[in-house]
Amino acid sequence: MGKPATPRALPENEAKAVARMLRVSPQKLNLVAALIRGKKVDTALADLEFSRKRIARDVKKCLESAIANAENNHDLDVDDLVVSQAFVGKALVLKRFHARARGRGARILKPFSNLTIVVREVRAEAA
């Protein structure tokens, strides 16, 4: 028997990809995510290709995964895809110890982030 299939959380014209545990602070990752929000996917890929930020490589990989999900799993047209959402969340924070003078210590925080990219198929109206 088994449980019935859960309904799809996204509309039929959307696909998403999630990159978890990226070793960067959410604030820095959000700078790159804001760069691609609302753009066509080919423009967003070009922007990420030439971005000087280190995390842009991981964001590009996640965007390519979202495009592949849209094409292979949901039969969407790649040429009509737009980045509808790109949002960042906090993951765990590694805490490390840094020895300082006079027997003291300082805490080093190494944050991790999660990135979710949602692409939407926007049909061009025939003029």
UniProtKB/Swiss-Prot annotation:
GO terms for cellular component: cytosolic large ribosomal subunit. Disulfide bonds: none annotated. The keyword Transcription does not apply. The keyword Ribosomal protein applies. GO terms for biological process: translation. Keywords: Ribonucleoprotein, Ribosomal protein, RNA-binding, rRNA-binding. Gene3D superfamilies: Ribosomal protein L22/L17. It comes from the Bacteria. GO terms for molecular function: rRNA binding; structural constituent of ribosome. Transmembrane segments: none annotated. InterPro entries: Ribosomal_uL22, Ribosomal_uL22_bac/chlpt-type, Ribosomal_uL22_bac/org-type, Ribosomal_uL22_CS, Ribosomal_uL22_sf. Belongs to the universal ribosomal protein uL22 family. Part of the 50S ribosomal subunit. This protein binds specifically to 23S rRNA; its binding is stimulated by other ribosomal proteins, e.g. L4, L17, and L20. It is important during the early stages of 50S assembly. It makes multiple contacts with different domains of the 23S rRNA in the assembled 50S subunit and ribosome. This is Large ribosomal subunit protein uL22. The gene is rplV.
